Swiss-Prot record:
Protein species of origin: Mus musculus
BP-aspect Gene Ontology terms: diacylglycerol metabolic process; fatty acid homeostasis; lipid storage; long-chain fatty-acyl-CoA metabolic process; monoacylglycerol biosynthetic process; retinoid metabolic process; triglyceride biosynthetic process; very-low-density lipoprotein particle assembly
Protein name: Diacylglycerol O-acyltransferase 1
Catalytic activity reported: an acyl-CoA + a 1,2-diacyl-sn-glycerol = a triacyl-sn-glycerol + CoA; all-trans-retinol + an acyl-CoA = an all-trans-retinyl ester + CoA; 1-octadecanoyl-2-(5Z,8Z,11Z,14Z-eicosatetraenoyl)-sn-glycerol + (9Z)-octadecenoyl-CoA = 1-octadecanoyl-2-(5Z,8Z,11Z,14Z)-eicosatetraenoyl-3-(9Z)-octadecenoyl-sn-glycerol + CoA; hexadecane-1,2-diol + 2 hexadecanoyl-CoA = 1,2-O,O-dihexadecanoyl-1,2-hexadecanediol + 2 CoA
Pathway the protein acts in: Lipid metabolism; glycerolipid metabolism
Transmembrane segments: 93-127, 140-165, 171-193, 201-232, 285-319, 327-364, 411-431, 440-458, 461-492
Amino acid sequence: MGDRGGAGSSRRRRTGSRVSVQGGSGPKVEEDEVRDAAVSPDLGAGGDAPAPAPAPAHTRDKDGRTSVGDGYWDLRCHRLQDSLFSSDSGFSNYRGILNWCVVMLILSNARLFLENLIKYGILVDPIQVVSLFLKDPYSWPAPCVIIASNIFVVAAFQIEKRLAVGALTEQMGLLLHVVNLATIICFPAAVALLVESITPVGSVFALASYSIMFLKLYSYRDVNLWCRQRRVKAKAVSTGKKVSGAAAQQAVSYPDNLTYRDLYYFIFAPTLCYELNFPRSPRIRKRFLLRRVLEMLFFTQLQVGLIQQWMVPTIQNSMKPFKDMDYSRIIERLLKLAVPNHLIWLIFFYWFFHSCLNAVAELLQFGDREFYRDWWNAESVTYFWQNWNIPVHKWCIRHFYKPMLRHGSSKWVARTGVFLTSAFFHEYLVSVPLRMFRLWAFTAMMAQVPLAWIVGRFFQGNYGNAAVWVTLIIGQPVAVLMYVHDYYVLNYDAPVGV
């Protein structure tokens, strides 16, 4: 009986072996499962020897898929593995969830858009935008102030010309540059505060233009000073690297760079840092330029529409909770304002740093197009400020941070000095046009110093990135509401909320 059972078992093993050979075209996993099934213990008919379950006959259909023939199903269908959402699984393809988030975002904002239209109607009025720039159609103070900035450009050029030939001493040249740069800061501010016909929006454009001019001429003065110092040491200066061919013939050295053509190219170039030889693109790409111009036009209209249709009603309805000091309503209005404010800020970033600066760079064949880096991946506040506005960051490092380190300042003092400078310009561009000084923008910028330490100390990785996004989404609406509230209190009666 036992011998018969053993013989039967042997025959069954050979049969299982034969099936696995016939199905040899299948994957190795299937062969292992057949082999495991053949040797798995089971009681035979006589109970004196293990009898394996018959292995399934695996075959391939014409499409190459595995099909199961006659026999029992596989005994093993589980293996050691983690759930996909577990960190140990190594799974990282969440594209479908990302698409779901985008769909939910679109649907949520579509509901807000419809709610806004039903509640307020269509508020977009392109003609009204003109009144933001001009009170009197016969008085154009802001454009006149911007045109007058050429006086300071010519003054800086003439100072450098005389320094190059030795007609001025370095001390006298420094004094004249300080006077010129100080006037650049004070002159437009005086116009914005004293001329009644200039509008707040016109003042912002004028002050922004003069602030850019200040940074450019500061860099122009520094680079020419470095060239003179190098010339004194080496008796011959060439700031560019030695190259051969046509590039070598086009390279400019000091003082040959002191021309109006060179200076005005720098004034219009999308950079704040002066060089004697800028990288140049070989040609103007017309299709690329056309795309950027169309983006500029489209996003300009989109920003104006969102401000008129979405932000203005929300801000107006936020005045009464501020007046009544209704904190729960203030928080609700703050969160309601955060969405359109942040969306407009993101659109402005793309419009200015990608569309506008690339369009200007393409026209001037300016080769360095790194106007921003991946600030959206910032895991710290410091990384965000270092990567979202590259022209300003380069200027701060080159003309402020490193000179302070060379003069013996610590890194912490130098960083604080950079934030102080940035805080001054933020307050300058907000308080002067509104003709009120509340220091909200200055305080917000200086608060970035302890905030950077807190985020860097307690938040890492994705949590740090989330903390940066929260400060961007919530922080800006707070400043906007503070200034708008104070401006309405000073100039108008607070409107009653709807």
